[in-house]
A protein has these predicted regions:
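Conserved small/polar residues in nucleotide/adenosyl-binding loops
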Residues: 176-178
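Hydrophobic/aromatic anchor residues within beta-strands of the central parallel beta-sheet
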Residues: 56-58
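Conserved S-adenosyl-L-methionine
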Residues: 5-10
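Glycine-rich phosphate-binding loop and adjoining beta1-alpha1-beta2 segment
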Residues: 15-51
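Conserved SAM/SAH-binding loop
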Residues: 60-67
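E1/E1-like adenylate-forming module used to activate ubiquitin-like modifiers
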Residues: 78, 83-174
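Short amphipathic alpha-helix with an adjacent loop that forms part of the alpha/beta core around
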Residues: 67-74
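N-terminal Rossmann-like FAD-binding beta1-loop-alpha1 element of flavoenzymes
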Residues: 1-2
Length: 178
């Protein structure tokens, strides 16, 4: 949404996920009305409400090494990564680098509550982030020596209980009247 409000006129949205009730506390597109809808469709509609002239292409697929061939990043001006899996992130970074397309990757934000602890830096300057550590190790093996990332310097908090719910594995939509 921020990109559309900033005047970016062409966006490709790639995600096979649907809005889940558990997304409402942290994702701007997630509302009670959008639960169950594809995130890319909800985002595209909102972007078109902001800028009716925007060109928005949606892809209901997860970006993985197996689906990467569907995308030619040589025609992209910039890539913003928010993939949840290490394998998807690595494939995206490697393909962006091969296409010489600038990329910024999001690192782990789970169990973090201090918005002032986020910063944009190079992957190799990050600390305390388990995802960044894995990405550093994997990308170093592949010869990637520089990558712009956003990450939090905050140590993750320990959840109060183990009630983490994922709509992929335990959909609670049928249990709740919306």
């Amino acid at each position: 949404e921020a990109l559309a409000r900033s005047g970016v006129g062409s966006l490709d949205l790639i995600d096979d996920d649907k809005v889940c009730l558990t997304n409402i506390n942290r994702q701007i597109y997630a509302t009670r009305k959008t639960v169950g809808q594809y995130k890319v469709d909800v985002a595209a509609e909102r972007i078109k409400d902001i800028n009716p002239d925007a060109v928005v292409r949606t892809y209901k697929t997860f970006y993985t090494p197996e689906t990467a061939d569907q995308f030619d990043f040589k025609h992209y001006d910039y890539i913003v990564d928010a993939i949840d899996t290490v394998t998807g992130k690595i494939a995206l970074v490697m393909n962006a680098k091969a296409a010489k397309t600038p990329i910024i990757c999001s690192m782990g934000a789970g169990n973090k509550v201090d918005p002032t602890a986020f910063e944009v830096t190079d992957l190799y300057k990050t600390s305390v982030c388990p995802l960044a550590k894995v990405m550093r190790n994997e990308l170093k093996k592949r010869g990637v020596r520089k990558l712009k990332v956003v990450y939090s310097k905050e140590l993750p908090i320990t959840p109060v209980d183990d009630m983490a719910i994922s709509c992929r594995t335990h959909c609670i939509l049928s249990l709740i009247h919306i």
